Amino acid sequence: KIYELGDELAVVMFGGLNYYTGQLFDMQAITEAGHKVGAKVGFDLAHAAGNVELFLHDWKVDFAAWCTYKYMNSSPGGVAGLFVHENHVSNEELLRLAGWWGHDKERRFLMEPQFKPIHSAESWQLSNAPVLGMAAHLASLDIYDEVGMSAISKKREDLTAYLEFVINEVSNSSAHTNFEIITPKNPKERGSQLSILAHGQLKPLFDILTKEGVI
């Protein structure tokens, strides 16, 4: 579709991992396609950050944003994350919603009339981050640093493969169960999520899980 629209496109904005199906998209291929038609490419990584390995700089993604309260465990209301490729951070003419926390740190408190952006993704910050929320987020990031995304990804693949096996075993064990996993079977095309169609069994299944204390 990107090639079909061609130079009609200015920006390609896409979800890196679909929240409904659990499908992980090939962000590198999407970025390359967008750049070939002259578009900037960005991603909503709300369901990908902390879930799958991301190489935004190497893929030459122009920008991305994500929340941290899901897989990154910073709790509801946790600070958001932002990526801007280094190719763009020195462009002071680039339009942005500018705030004082994105101003050159050396001159921030001089209260000058002109905005002087930091030459990094920091220049897109509007105000200072909430300290207590950042403390919770930092505790989670420390664990990620200690374990590493490669190890997390390997564990994720093992767990989802086992869950996929169990769901299929349960579905095939009785004529009264018919569960369909709509998340891609290829581990490289999904994250930690398996989405299931219950085919008419949703309410009974919901009631059973609720009775057992499953949220």
Language model features: what each stretch is:
Residues 1-215:
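Pyridoxal 5′-phosphate
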